[in-house]
Regions:
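Conserved HGGG/HGGXW glycine-rich cap/lid loop of the alpha/beta-hydrolase fold
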Residues: 7-61
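Short beta-strand/loop motif that positions the catalytic acidic residue
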Residues: 201, 207-209
Length: 263
């Protein structure tokens, strides 16, 4: 299993497929295995490079907090290890924040930018309802399995089958985060902000969002797409925060249409 070390932290990464490179950046407390629906689709025509953020999966759990800037540096180190100068960069949720920071810090390394289910930063973002925010904060009072179960109503669309949700839970079960790692990532999320910098992103950008996202309301995506100069917004009907599970065909169709336009 390949590891790289960045700032004294060991980061797990791997690659699947051939073709133009695409860097995949996962969200809060999720391992890179959660690309299990999207990665096989992309790997048919792209070189997919994925990694576990610090504190997640097989990567180290150093003392925190983990800043979004540090995790963007980890992403750059992964591309260095893969000997990739520039790549399509796709981040979801917290990974979308990391992808924004990556595009701001390393603009010449971004062939295109895909931002999924994300925000320009918590301090000024449109928040979830108070009930959903409380449920997220109460996660730390639960076991990891209880927390994963409690999250279902506000990260999946009500129309998504329980069978499909259970497939996601099965992927995650061996890589549930330590509570300190979750808190360390969450502190980085709450501290980060790109609202005043979005206009500086020069990459052609696709903003993907579930139309029924209860965790990160869709108005966050509208804000991002309106301020990045070369951005296109796609709202996915009947989808919530994890749109690749709610509506995989629609999500992957929009993603491939965008990526294939660069060939």
């Amino acid at each position: 299993m390949p590891f790289i070390e960045n700032e004294g932290v060991k980061i797990y990464w791997d690659e699947v497929g051939d073709g133009p490179a695409i860097l995949l950046i996962m969200g809060l407390a999720y391992p890179s295995q959660m690309w299990h629906r999207t990665r096989p689709v992309l790997a048919e025509r792209y070189r997919t490079i994925a990694f576990d953020n610090r504190g997640s999966g097989r990567s180290d759990v150093p003392p925190g907090p983990y800043s979004i800037e540090a995790m963007a540096s980890d992403a750059a180190a992964v591309l260095d290890a893969a000997d990739v100068r520039n790549a399509h960069v796709y981040g979801v949720s917290m990974g979308g924040m990391i992808a924004q920071e990556f595009a701001l810090q390393y603009p010449d390394r971004v062939r295109s930018l895909i931002l999924g289910s994300t925000t320009a930063g918590v301090p000024k973002s449109v928040r979830a309802s108070p009930e959903e925010t409380l449920r997220l904060l109460e996660r730390e009072q639960s076991t990891p399995n209880e927390a994963a179960e409690a999250a279902i109503p506000f990260i999946y669309d009500p129309g998504t089958s329980r069978e499909r949700i259970d497939e996601d839970l099965a992927v995650r079960k061996d890589w549930l985060p330590r509570s300190d790692a979750y808190i360390n990532q969450l502190m980085g999320v709450f501290a980060w902000d790109s609202h005043g910098r979005l206009e500086q992103i020069t990459a052609l950008t696709l903003v993907l969002h579930g139309a029924n996202d209860h965790l990160v309301p869709p108005s966050n995506a509208e804000f991002i797409a309106a301020r990045i100069p070369n951005a296109k917004l796609v709202m996915i009907p009947k989808a919530s925060h994890i749109y690749s599970t709610d509506q995989p065909e629609a999500a992957h169709g929009a993603l491939l249409e965008f990526l294939d336009s660069f060939k």
